[in-house]
Structures are given as structure tokens and as C-alpha cells.
């Protein structure tokens, strides 16, 4: 039986983030992107979410390499964790590789990982696959799409892209997409993020014009916060500041790191004598200073957060400061951003943000740009990716409007196995593809049971019941003593605490009278009686933790 090409998304479908796709044929396998996701509201204490790589680990001998489209966290953020389980060469463009190296250094993995630099136009042989790098525009420099030449046909994966004719690093290589379309494209996997938006994504030059307008009319200090990875935006801030005779200081760890990498690799060209050390800003007049900061998403302890809440060592918000938030809110971050904006206003600052001005443009293609890619590539099969269910469905509808056979459009899910032959492309089962939760240094040790307990604690708090029992006859020597955490304030609820102590005492007496000495049964009895009493009297269900000590 002839081998089949398998396309297996391990993340990025029916979700935003965690982008990772496996291509497998016979004894060869490659992975495109290796990103992280951010925890949902009910994932208490979880820092990051990464793809489940059980399938990769089982097939590690087949793995020929990781191919990365660009340097955003949702495409590179899981690499330090995944490479510890399945190590293989990592292929990317210079800037993307520089950002990956920063992440691997934090985990002491640089010397253990083969990092391979490529440029648009390069074709890399990886087993039976030939992976071609194609230049695209995005909100970070050095982004690429991949044309993956397989035994079944050419698979194009656009990665995150848009079409920006005025981009600093040149327009998306539409000529190459068109040439591939003429040669024949088997399948197109295309970015669906902005499929709900009509028209074209505005150019980055729109933001530059808006920033210039605000700089021109401002007589006070300017603080600009944006995504640290948006090098075109940062370059624009430096250029505009220089034009208006202002110095620029930078604050925020990720901003410092990316500035260093991008400057070393010649992706950022800072005007001479414009960059100043943050410790020098007090000696610079307000109308001659710009501060570029992290914190555009309201992240706790980011530079802008620390400024807003007066915990930044070098920068204190002053009345009249102009703060420009040059970024749009990622879904879920709106409350955090609003909180910071309100705090900045409270300190007398003027805050200018995207809802009021054209201070941000997306890095993803809108409908007309998507239509261009579909028209140029003319794929036999189409698989919408990089989006939630509504995005995938809308993108499928757009493909149908472009005249594509509905039978050749596949709506897959994370974990779906897409089997491809020269004539057919169909869904054929699933592989493990859950969410691995990262909490501090723990990877995968927080599961549904732990999350359920954390949710329980967050909602109703906890009661600890401490009791000392005699090792001779099981009688109560002292206690029960109660400790409340997150349930009620004990001093204000003494009657309730006394009643709870009586219930626990009664539970212990019942067990003693029945000659029950098994600790598990005693604990279960205390928990059951207290839970029933508390729900009846308070309509709340705190976690109850009996602690028995034997003396």
C-alpha cells in the first residue's frame, strides 16, 4: 500500500495560540511552529499552555526538524519545553532564530540544540520533504511562509501574514505564490485570524503618520508602549523621535532583549545619539524625551504596569505625560488594560489608545488579501488554520465564494489526522493533542483535578480542621481547632465557627463510639457533616481539610 501524507495540527485550530503542525510521510516527519497559548480565566495559577507532544515523542526517530515561520510567542514560545522532550534541528530566519536563542538560553538549551539559519528563497531538504522559505509581511520582521514539497504534492502554509506594499522589509512575495499556483498546489493551510474583516489590513505607515502627528503637537514627555516584537513600530518611534529632536529610552526586559538582538542582526537602525540609558532620563527635558515601554497588554509587573502603580524604579508618572498605547487588546486582556489606563489618568497623564486613534494595525490578512492568496495559489484542497471555529468556518465560506469545491475544504481540529493521497484529502482519526499546563517550573503536573481544587478554593475558600487523637484508645486529646482561609473572617463569625466546632466534635464522638479508628473514615465523616451543615446555613461549599495527629 502506498504511503499517505499526514497533516496533524497539534495546536492552533479552534483556539488562538499554541500553533504547531506535524507533516508526516513514511519514515519522515517535520514540525511547523511550536507556540504557546495563554491560560483561560479558570486556569488558576497556570502561567502558560503548550501543545501535547505525546505523538512526537512516540515518533521521535522520524523527526527531521522544526521549521518556524516567525518569532512571536504563539509560534516559538513552547520550544524550550518541547525540545526537552523531542530534540531536533530548528530552522528559521535570522531574527526568528535570534529570538529563539534568547528563550533557549533561559533554559540552558542553546548548546544542546542545532539552530540553522535560512533566508527567503532557501530550500531545505528534510527527509522526503523540501521546505521552501517565502517572504511575507507580518507585525514582526523576517516572517516567512512555507511551500513544503512532498511526495503527494506541494503544501503551502502561510503562517501569519498580510500584504503591505509599503513595508520596511519589502512586500509579501506574491510572485512566488503565483508561480507555485502555476506549478500546482496540492493544499493550502492559510491564516484565518482576520477573515471576519472586510477589505485590506491597513499599512504600518498609517501608524507612523498617527505617531508623528502626536509627537508634533506634544510639549511634554511621551511614553509609547507597544508589542516588543513589533520592530517596524519601534523603528518608527525612534525615527520620529529623532526627527522631533527627542531622545529615546527603553524599559522592560523583553524590549531590552529584542532591541539588542534586532540591532545586532541589523534589523533595527537606531538614529545616531538617539538612544539613552534609562538612568539618564532625569537630566533630559520633558519635551525632549520619549520612553518606549512594555506593557501594552496590561501584563502584571510589566514596565507600564509598574509606572501606573508607582513601583517603577526609574520612571514616575507625572501630570501631563502623554502615554500612547500603540497596540490593540488581545481578547481577555481588556480588563487589565482598562485598569492601567484608569490608573494613569488618575495620576494626571493623558492616555491615547487605539479606540481613539489609528495607533495600531493588525499583522494579519483581511478578506481581500486572503482572496489574493487563494487566487494566486489555486489549491486543490484547502484547510483553514490559525483561528477559532468561527474563523475557520468563515474562511471556508470565503473559499467557496472563490469557486472552490466544498468537498475539497476540510475543517479540522487540534489533534485531527488529515490523510492525503494524490487524489484525496480526508479526516482520518485523531492523536493525543490536549493542553499541557505550565506552572512555574512544573510542566504537565497541573491537571484537571488540581485545577478543580484551585477553582474550588478560589470560589469558596477552605476550612482546616485540626485534631489530636490518643494513640492508645483513639479518644480526642485536643481540638478540634478550625482555621478559615478565604471562607469567612473568623473574628467576625464566632457563632458560625463555634457551631462548626460542635459539628466536628459530634462527628469525632460518633466515630469513637462506633470504634472507628480508620483515619480515612474519620476524615470523611468530618467532611461530610461539615459540608452538609455549611451548605444548609451559608449556601457555600468550602474545601474542608481534616488534619489528624496521633499522640
Regions found by a protein language model. Give the residues of each.
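Short glycine-rich phosphate-binding loop at a beta-alpha junction
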Residues: 89, 383, 545
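His/Asp/Glu-rich metal-coordinating catalytic cores
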Residues: 2-67, 72-283, 302-316, 335-339
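Short Gly/Ser/Thr- and Asp/Glu-enriched loop/turn motifs at secondary-structure junctions
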Residues: 119, 413, 540-544
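A glycine- and charged-residue-rich anion-binding loop/surface
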Residues: 13, 37-41, 62-63, 353-356, ...
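Hard-cation-handling environments
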Residues: 196-326, 330-499, 503-515, 523
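C-terminal tails and terminal domains of large nucleic-acid-associated
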Residues: 515-551
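Conserved hydrophobic residues forming the short capping helix/wall of the S-adenosyl-L-methionine
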Residues: 104, 399, 534
Amino acid at each position: 500500500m502506498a504511503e499517505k501524507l499526514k497533516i496533524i495540527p497539534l495546536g492552533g485550530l479552534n483556539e488562538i495560540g499554541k500553533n504547531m503542525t506535524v507533516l508526516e510521510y513514511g519514515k519522515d516527519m517535520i514540525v511547523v511552529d511550536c507556540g504557546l497559548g495563554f491560560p483561560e480565566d479558570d486556569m488558576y495559577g497556570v502561567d502558560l499552555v503548550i501543545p501535547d507532544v505525546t505523538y512526537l515523542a512516540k515518533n521521535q526517530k522520524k523527526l527531521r526538524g522544526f521549521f518556524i515561520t516567525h518569532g512571536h510567542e504563539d509560534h516559538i514560545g513552547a520550544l524550550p519545553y518541547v525540545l526537552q522532550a523531542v530534540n531536533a534541528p530548528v530552522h528559521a530566519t535570522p531574527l526568528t532564530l535570534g529570538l529563539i536563542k534568547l528563550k533557549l538560553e533561559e533554559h540552558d538549551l542553546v548548546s544542546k540544540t542545532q539552530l540553522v539559519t535560512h533566508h527567503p528563497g532557501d530550500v531545505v531538504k528534510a527527509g522526503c520533504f523540501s521546505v521552501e522559505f517565502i517572504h511575507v509581511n507580518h507585525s514582526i520582521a523576517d516572517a516567512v511562509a512555507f511551500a513544503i514539497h512532498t511526495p503527494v504534492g506541494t503544501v503551502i502554509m502561510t503562517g501569519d501574514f498580510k500584504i503591505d506594499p509599503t513595508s520596511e522589509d519589502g512586500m509579501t512575495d506574491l510572485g512566488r505564490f503565483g508561480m507555485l499556483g502555476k506549478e500546482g498546489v496540492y493544499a493550502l493551510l492559510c491564516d484565518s485570524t482576520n477573515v471576519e474583516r472586510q477589505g485590506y489590513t491597513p499599512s504600518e505607515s498609517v501608524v507612523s503618520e498617527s505617531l508623528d502627528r502626536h509627537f508634533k503637537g506634544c510639549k511634554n514627555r511621551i511614553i509609547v508602549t507597544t508589542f516588543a516584537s513589533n520592530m517596524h513600530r519601534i523603528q518608527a518611534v525612534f525615527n520620529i523621535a529623532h526627527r522631533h529632536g527627542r531622545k529615546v529610552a527603553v524599559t522592560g526586559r523583553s524590549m531590552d532583549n529584542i532591541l539588542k538582538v534586532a540591532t545586532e542582526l541589523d534589523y533595527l537602525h537606531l538614529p545616531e545619539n538617539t538612544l539613552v540609558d534609562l538612568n539618564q532620563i532625569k537630566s533630559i527635558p520633558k519635551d525632549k524625551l520619549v520612553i518606549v515601554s512594555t506593557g501594552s497588554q496590561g501584563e502584571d509587573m510589566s514596565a507600564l504596569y509598574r509606572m501606573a502603580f508607582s513601583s517603577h524604579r526609574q520612571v514616575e508618572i507625572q501630570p501631563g505625560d502623554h502615554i500612547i498605547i500603540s497596540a490593540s487588546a488581545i481578547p481577555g486582556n481588556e480588563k487589565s488594560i482598562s485598569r492601567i489606563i484608569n490608573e494613569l489618568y488618575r495620576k494626571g497623564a493623558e492616555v491615547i489608545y487605539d479606540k481613539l486613534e489609528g495607533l495600531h494595525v493588525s499583522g494579519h490578512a483581511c478578506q481581500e488579501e486572503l482572496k489574493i492568496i487563494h487566487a494566486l495559489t489555486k489549491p486543490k484542497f484547502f484547510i483553514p488554520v490559525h483561528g477559532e471555529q468561527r474563523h475557520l468556518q468563515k474562511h471556508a465560506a470565503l473559499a467557496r465564494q472563490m469557486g472552490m469545491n466544498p468537498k475539497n475544504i476540510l475543517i479540522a481540529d487540534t489533534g485531527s489526522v488529515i490523510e492525503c493521497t494524490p487524489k484525496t484529502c480526508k479526516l482520518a482519526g485523531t492523536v493525543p493533542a490536549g493542553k499541557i499546563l505550565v506552572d512555574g517550573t512544573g510542566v504537565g503536573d497541573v491537571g484537571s483535578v488540581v485545577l478543580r481544587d484551585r477553582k474550588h478554593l478560589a470560589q469558596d475558600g477552605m476550612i482546616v480542621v485540626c485534631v489530636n487523637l490518643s494513640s492508645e484508645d483513639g479518644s480526642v486529646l485536643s481540638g478540634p481547632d478550625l482555621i478559615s482561609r478565604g471562607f469567612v473572617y473568623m473574628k467576625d463569625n464566632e457563632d458560625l465557627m463555634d457551631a462548626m466546632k460542635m459539628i466536628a466534635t459530634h462527628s469525632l464522638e460518633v466515630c469513637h463510639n462506633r470504634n472507628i479508628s480508620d483515619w480515612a473514615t474519620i476524615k470523611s465523616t468530618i467532611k461530610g457533616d461539615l459540608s452538609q451543615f455549611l451548605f444548609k446555613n451559608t449556601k457555600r461549599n468550602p474545601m474542608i481539610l481534616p488534619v489528624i495527629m496521633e499522640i
